[in-house]
From Swiss-Prot:
Name of this chain's protein: DNA-directed RNA polymerase subunit beta
One Gene Ontology term of the molecular function aspect: DNA binding
GO cellular component, one term: DNA-directed RNA polymerase complex
Native organism: Methylobacterium radiotolerans (strain ATCC 27329 / DSM 1819 / JCM 2831 / NBRC 15690 / NCIMB 10815 / 0-1)
Subunit details: The RNAP catalytic core consists of 2 alpha, 1 beta, 1 beta' and 1 omega subunit. When a sigma factor is associated with the core the holoenzyme is formed, which can initiate transcription.
Keywords, sorted A to Z: DNA-directed RNA polymerase, Nucleotidyltransferase, Transcription, Transferase
Amino acid sequence: MANTLVGRKRIRKFFGKIKEVAEMPNLIEVQKASYDQFLMVDEPEGGRADEGLQSVFKSVFPISDFASTALLEFVRYTFEAPKYDVDECRQRGITFAAPLKVTLRLIVFDVDPDTQAKSVKDIKEQDVYMGDMPLMTENGTFIVNGTERVIVSQMHRSPGVFFDHDKGKTHSSGKLLFAARIIPYRGSWLDVEFDAKDIVHVRIDRKRKLPATSLLYALGLDGEEILSTFYNKVVYDRDGADWRVPFDAERMKGMKATVDLIDADSGEVVLEAGKKLNARNARQITEKGTKFLKATDEDLVGQYVAEDLVNAQTGEIWAEAGEEVTDKLLKSLEEVGITELPVLDIDHVNIGPYIRNTLAVDKNSNREGALFDIYRVMRPGEPPTLETAEAMFHSLFFDSERYDLSAVGRVKMNMRLDLDAADTVRTLRKEDMLAVVKALVELRDGKGEVDDIDHLGNRRVRSVGELMENQYRLGLLRMERAIRERMSQVDIDTVMPQDLINAKPAAAAVREFFGSSQLSQFMDQTNPLSEVTHKRRLSALGPGGLTRERAGFEVRDVHPTHYGRICPIETPEGPNIGLINSLATFARVNKYGFIETPFRRVRDGVVTDEVAYLSAMEEAKYYVAQANAQMDENRKLTEDLVVCRRAGEVIVVGPERVDLMDVSPKQLVSVAAALIPFLENDDANRALMGSNMQRQAVPLVRADAPFVGTGMEAVVARDSGAAIAARRAGIIDQVDATRIVIRATEEADANKPGVDIYRLQKFQRSNQSTCITQKPLVRVGEFVKKGEIIADGPSTEFGELALGRNVLVAFMPWNGYNFEDSILLSERIVKDDVFTSIHIEEFEVMARDTKLGPEEITRDIPNVSEEALKNLDEAGIVYIGAEVNAGDILVGKITPKGESPMTPEEKLLRAIFGEKASDVRDTSLRVPPGVTGTIVEVRVFNRHGVDKDERAQAIEREEIERLAKDRDDEQAILDRNTYARLADVLIGQAPVAGPKGFKKDTTLTRELINDYPRSQWWQFAVIDDRLMTEMEAMQKQYDESKKRLEQRFLDKVEKLQRGDELPPGVMKMVKVFVAVKRKIQPGDKMAGRHGNKGVVSRIVPIEDMPFLEDGTHADIVLNPLGVPSRMNVGQILETHLGWAAAGLGRKVSKAVDAYLKTQDIAPLREEMKAIYSPGELDGLTDEELAEAGNNVRRGVPMATPVFNGAKEADIEQMLEMAGLDRSAQSTLYDGRTGEPFDRKVTMGYIYMLKLHHLVDDKIHARSIGPYSLVTQQPLGGKAQFGGQRFGEMEVWALEAYGAAYTLQEMLTVKSDDVAGRTKVYEAIVRGDDTFEAGIPESFNVLVKEMRSLGLNVELTSSKKAANDQLEPPADAAE
């Protein structure tokens, strides 16, 4: 870390013992690599590979018309530059996308009417616009309609073949019924399954089942071939009254002899009944020379004939293949003199007669019948013909248009069934189906294992690119139908490709996917960690995945193959637990979509630095040692027995048998879990909460990196894109709060400018309304390398993730205020803005063109006092910096209302005073309840052709000035660099020509050259040709750069001045951003990193907080009872180490002060050398060391990586070094009495986060508000400004209490008695406090509903007098 610019400014002490050999992959590579592979924006030499977008076009094109007289071919595709850049898209609310142009070739044929021979008549090529394709931003997100979205990767079942059984649940006997299923990437599913009677059936697409032999018949096999495929043949030879059968040791090995085995030649008993034939006695029998065994007729009865026995002369069939051998059959065979009887090798123990039995029950006996049967199942009610049945069967599994196993499916199938088809064979073959049935029968015979569908070798990841590819294919297929029809309708000789294509379906498919797919999610942008985690998320839900209700326990559970691939900790609590997972830190996705994790190779017990990435299937073959296996200095494994994993089991083997070793202890957890120090000391449930709550931490006004970190903080800050990294090496030229200008020093590419300008985001709103703001970390003149952090973003400090603050905690009860996880805070926390955050709310208003006339944004609003307009400018828009409260006007807007007929008096008044205000109503944008803050930004959007108001013009002028400043700065640096290079070339030369007044052959010096204006330097001419060409090239490059710069500026200005694309009917739109400063207050939720969460119960004056002997007050008091039962001891260890870190910080602080006085760096260097590990301070200059020391005054930051961090001894050593008690407990004094507490208290620094559950967002009150239209009851919820529901149970409570009048009030005048509501109001205004309840509207709704069912209900009153007032129910609701 100390070798980067920012890393030198503050150095983190590292406790890790295990050296990491593998580089952690970029955290958002999953997204970027996948989408890049799909788009392939730049076409490589030799054309694009057949994947992604290219393969989609290739699979749909060429398209021919119905008569095959024309063909539309795909040539290539290209992307044009996007119209707007990322920031412009965000501001204007549009999608960041690039236009896709496809080159198509239309070939028209001439067909000879006699011979039907085709000849090419005409070929036309044209570029066709195919809609916009969304582009991914630098940070792996998409901008759709102005909001950032993430496409979450999906985990689904890998295509291929799976074998499984029903776990004995189907049949009452508990018998296992085996089944196989072939799952393609797209196409029909094929199931092969046993039933309780051991007959094999097939189902296609979960339809009605058929005997499996029907499928085999349909594949073209006949009965005899089916039997010979599945069974071996044994030939029995007549030997007098008995039979001779060949002795095959291999086949019979492991079988038990039911009768004595007798040698057919010698008559000797070679194996007694009841004994098992094992390798030893099989060898003995073979050595004796036994070739044949003796068999009797009894042995043959019950066997099955292997092939048809036919009389060659007459063609008479004596026995059919598969027929059972009976005494009767044997007799008849003896009579006709047959001495050889081939039977199937079925012993009912190791080999069962399942296929033979299936063949026997199958009513079909030929291909035609089988095809008809399959056709009837798939298309019931249609009469089959042989052609249609054959065509349908072919299209089910053998047609590449309809059926695609995908490369993955083929690879998986080859592995499972030991086949060797190339992975380009994407349809099923006859061999595949036979192999599946064979494997299934073998399973039933007890050979082999069923598959585990939760094994990560059987689940794969579909990332953005693949999801998008599938979606685009659907769009193109819809388009293809339209093109075919179009080609047949038009005169094909005169049209161009453009006229045939309507790209709407393709564009609509893309739009639908990004806008409304379950996997396209609104990005969680609360803080940088939540962004990274969202992009690394794996969901089992979504189209083609599981549903919450159907997912059982097994799918959600942690599986041994998750190790190093999927985090066992980070998953949501609740219904989605285990269905939404997170990728582990080192994991990556391979080309087949399987998750891989890295291992170090181990050879002969010696660990190498060679790293191999393996998927779950590949890993199963190896013995894998843990990352913490003990080694000597030569990396030889030292233990006699090493604990290893193999195929999901933990075993102990000798070091020479170890094949691989984990690369890092943190490779099994995800990014969020890897940020929890002392994770190994926390209970898993609490660690889960800890990793989930870090994602909800709100960025604070002042970020503060943790004293006790894990070393992952810098990685997350860099990869999330929150902190800005330098694109090229260079020297800082200018820095201010809004931008950093770097002069590039690496050899500049002629097309790139020699200067990089980084615009910093200032007070921008994130998706979750948190505040995104960046601040520079570099100073003018500093040199930065490529990739170094130059600016901090939200929740980062010195390029490290900083989600919360380090606060001084005391673990002790405090007058019940920290009962049940409540948190007690000191007033200092509020006063010093420790947990203050800024939230930016966005409000927008549109002025539309209505039927009655256009709405108008103006300051001139009827019946509004001047006081209410104090914050508006002359255009009626609030000015920046105004402080606004709930109800204040942000944008004045009036809407025309329909003219009502006027009375004569009104007409007269109107004629006299010209009063016009009555025909408009006030529809201004006001601040909603509960919001107070400062206006930080206003954006005004105008439709094309609508005149801009003064405010819009002012905003535009400001923006143009900013762009001009950027251009001028870039120009200045370009001038400086170019002319410096030119001066270097010219000085010392004696030009033969030059500007006016130059004497030729004068040797140029710097003073001489500076006498001329720089623009005239190009006029110097020297004799040296090489120098002249160099100067000319330099001048050309300079002129081009200058031109490009100016052009870029003009383009941007033109975009600004152009009108905006607004929704239809909208003339003008104004967006107002209000920044709300939220201090921490009782009711806010806070949490540590160990799942220790709580709600702030009280904020206590600092003088009442417990304090130490030196007068330091605790910032926060937590309840010690929150620790033991929750078993998250990590927080206590963190507190201890944080205490040591602060103590060491105090020591360094003293040394820095001494250095500032004496300017002697040696004592400071010694002090810091004692703290840090050897080598961590190497290469630091004195100034850098002093700066590093100054930056750790508050506490020396430490890194204790998960499973590889500080142990108790290390913590004690640090405490001693800091001069603190080894117990890390201190005597505390009660702030209110000044008395010491009886026992010492654990005190230290803990890292606390303020979560996004703020009381200000939840608290809500209503007096008068909106009512529901039908029921007339108040709406519910804060967003609707609703009331609190007085529900069924609350009614019971009032009934039980006997509070009849209160109850009546609740159910009528306070809810939905419309007339009663107004009467109550009038009575209260009059000062009268009696009122009567009427009929609630919900009663009328009920009556109306009953009437709609044809039940007439009428309300009659028993009181005669009351009848006059009560209207008949028919009109009650009107």
